[in-house]
Structures are given as C-alpha cells and as structure tokens.
C-alpha cells in the first residue's frame, strides 16, 4: 500500500483503490484508479486486436478490379503507381498480393471467414489478369527512362522479380493453396514458374534473365522455385535453380579481406558512383549467399554451399564492431573500402536481412560460428540504439523492408532460433515502438475515444524524409507492421503461421 501526503491530509492506495483522508482521518470518498493505457504491457491478444484494426483501415482503401479485389497503394498520395517498381497494383511488396497474404495470415489467427474472402478476392484478380510470358517479354526489354526519381524503372530484373512480378503474386497464391487445398491455386503457381523458366536466357551451362542477378532480381526466383519444389517435388524447379546457380558462380570475385564478393547490380544506373557496390541482402553479397544456401538445399551440390560460406567470409571480413555486436557497412568499394560511417539496420541492407545467410548456414551445417554471427548481428541493432533511436540508415519508413517492423520480424526469428528471453525482450521493445508509430483517428464527435482503424505513415525514400504517406502494402507499409505484430503474438503463443518467403525455410 502506498501513502501520499497532501496538504489537507493523505491519500492511500491499495489494489488500485484510492482513498482520501482529511487531517482528522475521516474518509472523503473512494475512487478506482483504472490502468493507464500508456503503461500497459501488450499481450498477444492486443497484437491481434491491432492487426484487426489494421485490416479495418485497409478495407477503406479497397477497390474493385476486373474480377476481384485491389487496394490503393497509398490513398493519400497523388502519385500513379501503375508502373512504379515494387508498388504496382498486384505486387507482393506494395500491392494486392502482399495485402492478400496479410489477410490470409489474419484468417489463420482469427478464423474469421471475412479475411479469407478478402484474400481469395485478391487471388481471383491476380489469376484472371495474369499476362503469362508476355509480361516477361515486355518487362525484360524495357527502354530506359530519364526520370531520376524512379530510375529503378531502368532495372528490368527488379521489375520482373519476386517483389514486383508474378512470382511474388504466385507465392501468395501458393500459400492460399496450402490453407484451402484448392487445386486451381497450385495450378496457377506452377504456370507462373513454368513461364519464368521458359523465358530464361542460356549461357554455357547456366541460365539467367536480366543484368540484375541479386536477390531482388534474378536471384529472387530461387526461393519461389524452392517453395514450389517442396510441394510438387517436380525436379524441373531444382534443375532451373541449379542452372542459375552455375551462372551466378561465375560472377564472384576474391575480396581483399577474405571470402568472395558478388557485385551483380550496376549501381551507376541509379546514379551511384561507379566504384561502389552493395553488400547486404537484398542486393549484395549476403543476399547472393542466401540464394546459394537455398540452391544447396535443393541440389545438395557442395559447390553452392561453399559459395554461401565464401559470401559469409566476405561479410565477416568487413563487419565492424566487437565480439558481442557487429554491423555491416551499407557500401563497399575496391578503391575506398567499406563505408564504415553508413549502416542500414533493417531487412534491406541491414543486419536483419544479412543475418538470414548466417541463419541458413547454421541450419545446414550446425556450426556454432554461424549461430554466433546471427546473435552478433542482432545485438548490433540494439547497440546502434534501435529500435527507439533512428539513424542515417534506420529512418521512420514504417516499412517491413527498411524500418522498425523489419527489426521486429528479425528479433522474433532469433527468439525462435535461440529460445533466449533476451531476444524476446528485444522483440517486445520493438513491438512497442511499432505500435507507437501507428495512428488511430479520434472517434467522430467523441474525443474521449478512437476509431477502430489503425494505419502507419512513413517516408519510403530515405533521401526524401518529407515525402510521408500511408501505404497499404506488406513490405512498404501498414500491412507489414500488423504482420510483424502477428509474428510476435504467434511466437508468444507457440503457434505457427504462414511466413514471408525470407523466413519460410528455417527449421
């Protein structure tokens, strides 16, 4: 019991019951002190509630397509995203496939058929408007644009790849098949993979599709082939992965500090200096190494495992930190060395993404070195001041790709790997930050209460911090924030849910 002395007497508190006394000891009145909402420690039920509030907001952005459902990529932006890489209407990254995947996961958690209906409506639109091989024939031969803000349009491999193109959409539909067992879904998923393979270019004993060989470009087809092989056991998907791996092996070069690096994207196309190259997932060596690990899992060919290990050695050779915590620079250069004053922290370009390579190698080899590096990279995020403090490469994007939700997904994964409460505590801290960055409007005519719809607004472009919008999508915006809250709730409850493809291969 706490006693508070006041000028006219005292106040006592016990079990939330407040009693005021005057100087003679006589009680004035009794009040019940309710729990302060800002002091609350969130529970799994809270995270599910927040996710359902998110679904309510996304519903307000819905629109009818030719046969099914789409959602506005950003209802408060005036930009046209129809040909905007990563944000095209049906993309997994920022379009309807990602929103549909979120609704499917929410259906798993709640068993509310309305969410499954939303997911299936998204799938119907994707399937009915699929272009087939014509999409690749058009996309992989696009002419360059001079628009400097969107010069990612000059990267055909990214436009055709998993995050933006049909394979990412088909991943969502493959997950629908796993839950519903509707044969139409697996048929579509196979059709998409077969079309990708049919348009591959052949060189020596390998295949490729574009000049962008990274995990965002040609390399992104490999996790999709791996997913499809797991279900169908069709060896043609293994064969395609092997052939691409053979081609990718030829692009590696010895690194000055050990290991092998892969510079597989020409960054001058997007106005970077010609001497620099990216290091981390999704565009650099750690992403390539992750692809090699997946190819090894499919083929059991040791040369691909060795390549993944070489990629890890390169990352270890340029990492900066101590025995407990490290970060990996954003850029490297054979002329200037690594950018030791510039670090991203989340999934794209940061330790949340690069740790996937070490996690995969630990799963394959059981070697403690790789396990330890997962922990070092994870602790590096915390030592950098995240999740609460932002920095040059960790800004308020509110994106699963490059913001706080990407950290939450990572910490949940490391907690599941280790069972260590240290990483659960990191996840819970990060979840509080994620929730704290969301916005819920005041109820109409009632400032004491709020509406039941939650969204996030962020600056997707690191270099344009004032370009803030609410995005609906999975990797760019609101759906992704709620997705990661469901990840934490599932980990706390010991439940298994569908995963994004990056986390779908771990034991």
Q: Which role fits each region the language model picked out?
A:
Residues 14, 32-507:
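Glycan-recognition and catalytic cores of secretory/periplasmic carbohydrate-active enzymes
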Residues 1-2, 33:
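Accessible peptide chain termini
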């Amino acid at each position: 019991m706490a006693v508070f002395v006041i000028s006219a007497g005292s106040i006592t508190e016990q079990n939330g019951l407040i009693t005021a006394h005057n100087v003679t000891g006589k009680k004035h009145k009794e009040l019940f002190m309710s729990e302060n909402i800002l002091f609350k420690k969130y529970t799994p039920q809270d995270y599910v509630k927040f996710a359902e509030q998110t679904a309510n907001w996304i519903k307000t952005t819905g629109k009818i397509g030719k046969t099914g459902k789409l959602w506005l990529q950003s209802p408060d932006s005036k930009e046209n995203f129809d040909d905007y890489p990563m944000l095209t209407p049906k993309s997994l990254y920022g379009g309807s496939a990602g929103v549909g995947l979120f609704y499917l996961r929410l259906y798993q958690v709640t068993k509310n058929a309305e969410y499954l209906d939303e997911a299936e409506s998204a799938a119907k639109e994707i399937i009915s408007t699929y272009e087939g091989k014509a999409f690749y024939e058009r996309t992989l031969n696009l002419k360059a644009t001079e628009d400097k803000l969107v010069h990612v349009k000059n990267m055909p491999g990214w436009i055709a790849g998993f995050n933006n193109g049909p394979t990412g959409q088909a991943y969502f539909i493959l997950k629908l098949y796993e839950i519903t067992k509707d044969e139409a879904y697996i048929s579509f998923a196979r059709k998409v993979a077969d079309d990708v393979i049919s348009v591959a270019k052949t060189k020596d004993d390998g295949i490729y599709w574009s000049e962008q060989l990274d995990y965002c470009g040609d390399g992104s087809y490999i996790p999709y082939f791996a997913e499809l092989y797991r279900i169908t056991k069709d060896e043609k998907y293994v064969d395609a992965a092997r052939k691409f791996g053979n081609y990718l092996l030829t692009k590696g070069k010895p690194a000055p500090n050990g290991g092998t690096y892969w510079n597989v994207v020409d960054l001058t196309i997007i106005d970077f200096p010609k001497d620099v190259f990216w290091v981390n997932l999704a565009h650099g060596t750690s992403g390539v190494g992750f692809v090699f690990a997946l190819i090894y899992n499919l083929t059991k060919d040791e040369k691909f495992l060795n390549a993944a290990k070489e990629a890890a050695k390169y990352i270890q050779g340029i990492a900066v930190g101590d025995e407990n915590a490290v970060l990996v620079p954003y850029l490297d250069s054979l002329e200037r060395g690594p950018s030791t004053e510039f670090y991203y922290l989340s999934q794209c370009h940061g330790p949340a993404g690069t740790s996937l390579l070490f996690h995969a190698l630990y799963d394959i080899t059981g070697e403690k070195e790789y396990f330890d590096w997962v922990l070092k990279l994870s602790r590096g995020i915390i030592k950098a001041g995240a999740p609460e403090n932002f920095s040059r490469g960790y800004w308020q994007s509110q994106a699963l790709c490059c913001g706080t939700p990407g950290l939450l997904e990572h910490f949940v994964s490391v907690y599941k790997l280790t069972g260590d409460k240290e990483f659960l505590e990191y996840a819970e801290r990060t979840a509080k930050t994620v929730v704290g960055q969301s916005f819920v409007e005041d109820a109409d005519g009632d400032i004491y209460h709020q509406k039941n719809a939650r969204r996030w607004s962020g600056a997707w472009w690191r270099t344009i911090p004032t370009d803030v919008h609410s995005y609906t999508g999975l990797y760019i915006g609101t759906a992704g924030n709620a997705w990661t809250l469901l990840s934490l709730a599932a980990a706390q409850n010991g439940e298994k849910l569908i995963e994004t493809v990056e986390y779908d291969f771990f034991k």
